[in-house]
Amino acid sequence: TVTVAGEGSYTIDPTTGAVTFTPEKDFVGTAKGVTVQATATITNANGKTATITSDATYTPTVVPAVPTTSPATSKDIQGATQTGTPTFAGTTVQVNGEDKAITIKDNSYTLLDKDGNEVSTTPAYAEDGTTPIGTFTIDPATGQVTFTPTDKSYTGKVTPVKVQAESSNGIKVDTTYTPEIVPVTPTATPAETKDIQGATQTGKPEFKGGTVEVNGVEKTVPINEDVPATFDDGST
């Protein structure tokens, strides 16, 4: 075996002389090649023998064949679960007049965590890249990524998560999915009362759920009537 750093490795079948080149995954272009030597023994009419050798080179060329990618984004209101599916597309390359199709391997979709490890779930961070605000999970069969917020008070962009897929020729490519959280603020109408000196008075401010337009659709977050009203210091 002969290994050329940055290119790949060569093996030879000593019986047939066939050379096999196994390229490194990122190598493209024409390799430096290797020298192949054959030895033969000849015998002349007098019965004397001699050994002769002959050298030849083998030079492989690797044609680029990388899938294409497109990132995904989504936008929704505070507290909503969001999904996005980045696009991974195969390609076709022509080699020696023959079309060769490159496809995406089944069930090869995965997330990459902050350290570049392949994972099926990973924390989601605020735009600062350090504050955890939720989780990302992925469907390995479809590549759909789900963002589930845990800090429902956070609004703004979420740090993009890397999404990876592998092609049929063993090339791993990645792109991103970026959710954005739109703030929704409930509205309040103050209450006023008037009565005589010493009389107990009762008033009830009116609260309505916040409404915002997201991607052309009006969305409302209703007031949770199961949560009791309190004063601004939390007391009742």
Identify what each model region corresponds to:
Residues 73-81, 192-201:
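Short, solvent-exposed loop/linker segments at the N-terminal edge
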